[in-house]
Amino acid sequence: MRDIFSFFEKPKDPLSFSAIRISLASPEKIREWSHGEVKKPETINYRTFKPERDGLFCAKIFGPVKDYECNCGKYKRMKHRGIVCEKCGVEVIQSKVRRERLGHISLATPVAHIWFLKSLPSRIGNMLDITLKDLEKVLYCEAYIVIDPKETGLMRGDLLSEERYLQLLDEYGDDKFSAGMGGEAILEMLKQVDVHGLAELLRTEMRAATSEAKRKKLAKRLKVVEAFRESGNRPEWMMLTVIPVLPPDLRPLVPLDGGRFATSDLNDLYRRVINRNNRLKRLLELNAPEIIIRNERRMLQEAVDALFDNGRRGKTITGPNKRPLKSLSDMLKGKQGRFRQNLLGKRVDYSGRSVIVVGPTLRLHQCGLPKKMALELFKPFIYNKLEERGYVNTIKSAKKMVEKERPEVWDILEEVISEHPVLLNRAPTLHRLGIQAFEPVLIEGKAIQLHPLVCAAFNADFDGDQMAVHVPLSVEAQMEARVLMMSTNNILSPASGKPIINPTQDIVLGLYYATRERKFEKGSYRADTLAFGEDGVAQGYLRGIYASLEEVRMAYDNGEVALHAGIRVRVPIIDDDGNPQLDEFGHVKRRIVETTVGRVIISEVLPKGVAFEYANKTLDKKALSALIDVCYRIHRNKETVLLADRLRTLGFDHAMRAGISICMDHMVIPPAKKVLLGEAQKEVERVVEQYQEGLITDGERYNKIVDIWASIADQVTTEMMAGIGKETVVDHETGKESIEPSFNPIYIMADSGARGSTQQIRQLAAMRGLMAKPSGEIIETPITANFREGLSVLQYFISTHGARKGLADTALKTANSGYLTRRLVDVAQDAVISEFDCGTLDGIRVAKLEEAGEVIQPLGDRILGRVALEDVVDPLTGEVLITANTELDEQAVRSIEDAGIEEVVIRSVLTCQLRRGVCALCYGRDLARGYRVNIGEAVGIIAAQSIGEPGTQLTMRTFHIGGTAARGKIEASYLEARTEGTVRLRRAVVQKKKDGTMVVMNRHGEIVVVDETGREREHNRLVYGAILKKADGERTKPGELLAEWDQFATPILTEVSGVVKFGDLIEGVSVQDRLDEVTGLSRKVVIESKAADVRPRISLKDPESGKTLKLPNSELEARYLLPVGAHIVAQEGDLIEAGEVIAKIPRDTTKVQDITGGLPRVAELFEARKPKDHAIISEIDGEVTFGKDTKGKRKVIITPYSPDGHALGDQAREYLIPKGKHIQVQPGDRVRAGDPLQDGPPNPHDILRVKGEKELSAWLVNEIQQVYRLQGVGINDKHIEVIVRQMLRRVRVREVGDTNFLVDEQVEKHIFEKENETVLERGGKPAIAEALLLGITKASLSTESFISASSFQETTKVLTEAAINGKTDDLRGLKENVIMGRLIPAGTGLPAYKRLQVVVEGEPVAQAPYVAPRPRPEETLTAVNEE
């Protein structure tokens, strides 16, 4: 009886284990797993199709082919369960055991496991201290190895050639030493290894080692030896004497028709191993000659290598069709491997897909599901209901009934579907909003209807996109779909916290049209219509003024007033929190506002508490977004959803009524275009003339011409927009004319944000402008025509470059972006909110973000939704505005900005002290929900998606412009004041020339504008060589010029007046006369010289004595070394004054900056790569001096100063800067730690070393944000911080102390801290480590979980490493749990929630609300633990 029960028992629940361990298998273990030895290479009998005995498919070893039936057919049926047939030896049992029973092959000679041999570093090699090359020689039978030298004077592990071996045998005899070749020799040596002794020996050697290289080598060996010591693995297990054989159903052999077979490659590989093994056994029995046996051994080793990892060593073994055979390693690796194909991505049942069409009448939580599709998807539910209702008695008849599509079936389908959410998904699913839940509504036809407002989240359009539908089956799944995934609960974007259900396209157009005002319409407000009679009684009435909003509606419905008429109306006054203001009698206060009829109609759909002001403006896309945002902040979910739906209906309705269409005449070409083009042409000619006279270089000419055309194109565009955007309106009553914003359809579309941009209209009606070559440079002759005038053949040809490049880029970059997302997800997957508060006392300082004096992001935007670390105090009154550890919500941010606070210290993920995961307070607000984050939220994955998703968007965005060269940020060449105040110079050295111009002579100067109270209003860095327009202490007004400079070249200025003398400027060696073909003029350019002692320079001599002049305030001489590529401006023998330019270093010509620069840049930052030609930065604060040059490199010395002003010479640091690089500092400059000494991009690892983790993370966040900002993509800083936190998880051990670490070992921070705590408790000396920045790929591969790392990249390497260390995976991350088939430990799968018991009392509720109630942040969940 018990057998019957055990037969029906469920498979092992994945929850029943808590960790998984990987280690090496000993030969005994393999034999223990095995159900028998495979002795023959035969598979199945090709006539009977029965497996051959002792072959690869043997039924005796692996189990029966048919359920409960032995091979010879003596025992059939269930009643003989568990009997072993005496005739054919097959156990009578279910055939599925053929999926789990292993066999084995006993090898005639030990072979090396290729993973431990070839996977670098070679573990066997490390264990025995033999190089891989020598090891292979021994294993592949090409040399002998000394196993035990005894008293011969040889060394253990020496290689001997054949002749030498024979010679030694003659000399000593075979009992005086032992040597061997092949697997046996290596196995013997590994057996002799004493792991503990070896570890001790290596540690002693390391202490004694002098050279760094030797220490590193010993540390590597020690690592492997330690791994074996701690894991309990034996070194000899890296050699195989027994090989396990995979269960046959995992490497099937399927007969095809026509007597052929389809087979798994593994069978071929096993067959080779068995054949060679049997042959070797036979040869050994026959005592064959040594050379034949050697050859056979080598072949066996090669066969086993191919089975484990084909192609790793030697030639790849190919099948009959010249295709490489897939080995066991290939089964795991890559996108098609076991991990990514079957464990991380599975196909699901109960799903369908179809084309989507727009559903303009759906509510936000609905989607239209075709009837036929629904019938198929909900079949089991329908069968169940049909039986319940008694329509049918069996499933079979239910099936028939459904197939006939009887009317009862449709009624039941309606019932089953109501309140049962389905999931819609559109590929590619780039962020979590790519899958959302909707309630299905049955529709005719075959296409799925989708609500237009969720298109932005899915990135869907209706040009043929397809979407998939999935049905959540269990009650729990349905509940999660409804509460967490319903489209109505995903109103805000998790990336930025802004609404994502913004109206787009027609809806925007309709609402914009409805809320525009048109002068002199029927029923407009007119102040001049009121006349008084002689008795002072009013005659007539005031037109266009209304007592209430309802009155306006009535007038409009009766045709008294037009939609666009400007009117006045009384409205209630509402405060910021959405409450109406009352007067002393308790009545609502009202006021009269100017508005239009359309705006009043729109205001009718606003929820109570949203002020009329939000509807009382022309509603373009931005205003609508703001309106939804405000509605969400005041009313939360339900009202916002209703508002969005109402706006959708109104928008479509008005767009239809407006009947907007476009034609050629709407593209008005500005009359000024001709004039402007003429002017530009003249300017270009002027520049060319300057070039021909030799005043400017070819590069400068190119830059200037491109600049001229870029600005002319902008001017023509401005003219055109002005022309399209304005029209003349005539008042029919008085005949007066007035110029008003126009209703030109093209203008309306762009202005409202519905479709198109200034960029595109400019191509239609102004000029196409500059285009880019395929190489990315800008062609200097622009396309002056526009599409209305039509392009000439040449112009059309130039245009095609851009268009083609756009398409090519898109294809390439989509892949890149997807890969970036994958790496980000992998590195951040285990960042989960695991506790409420970590109790940290550390945080980061945040101030407003400025660039080139312009505020890019105000302080409020940066701190919204974060948590304050300490009390925020008003600087003037000293009153505490916000207490520590409070979330900074909209109101708090407003009070901080009103108080004029410049910077706030907030808690950040970067400084969170939790060892695993992140705490809720350090993370702050959950952007997608708008309140504090819940415990269990998978913030790492959200961060990865938020960063990766726009990457793909951006890559796809390039080709819409059609390749018009949108020049990236052209660097500014001047600085204007933005506020009124007094100019102050800080740390700036200024030289006044004879003509009165002031030149900035140093690099770290700043110019500040202060107001009356002495508060700093703005401050900017001054560029070296800039010409100041305002002196220190001068007053300035907004818009006045403070300084200007040349943005195309960096000058080298002289600090003293004197005669120019060239040094080492030898024609053809260090300087070249670049002759300009066009102008015939030459210009000296410094080139790289081969000689080490040549140092091109310019010195300044005293005109009288001829001696080299000294620099001001120093003993150094006025010599200026010239970097490679510098253009020399001064002539030898000229008398020049201080502050003049003697040479220029040209900057690169501007290339088009689109996200091409962007994506690789983001990847480069996240991978923490060293940029090429990176800047050398100073590690300390101090004063600069120059030392003697060494090996053609310049020596810069920085000497620190003590607080009382003494130079600390013994702590000085020296830096060598390569010749030909431009040094940014001058002798005598004071530099701070982290300042660059030469130009070039900074190296993130240097920043970390010099300035620490906080500075580095601030820099990284800013650099990454810059790329996204350029594209107008908003991502919250905290997402990037989460990723940076994961990159900074590890430390590098510098000194080991009394811990078990090795020098230079990389360990997780929390393991390091834990180990140190243990050592300190014992009274030992702790280890010292330095922070380490890992790129995201490196960081993912070095996670604690080997399952997660191996499913990411380099599978074999990770598994090899893990097996040797005997690693245990505690299944803490998300990925490991998905692979093991468990619930992920995040969200509702959090261990804390698993123990929750839900008790239901009373009757079930008939109707569940479709909007999920949101847990208030105040109410904390109390868990009921089951005891």
From Swiss-Prot:
EC number(s) recorded for this UniProt protein: 2.7.7.6
SUPFAM superfamilies found in the cross-reference section: beta and beta-prime subunits of DNA dependent RNA-polymerase (SSF64484)
Any matching Pfam family: RNA_pol_Rpb1_1
Keyword ATP-binding annotated: no
Catalytic activity: RNA(n) + a ribonucleoside 5'-triphosphate = RNA(n+1) + diphosphate
CDD domains recorded: RNAP_beta'_C (cd02655), RNAP_beta'_N (cd01609)
GO cellular component: DNA-directed RNA polymerase complex
Annotated Zn(2+) 1 binding sites: 70, 72, 85, 88
Lineage: superkingdom: Bacteria
UniProt KW Nucleotidyltransferase keyword: yes
EC class name: transferase
Family: Belongs to the RNA polymerase beta' chain family.
Name of this protein: DNA-directed RNA polymerase subunit beta'
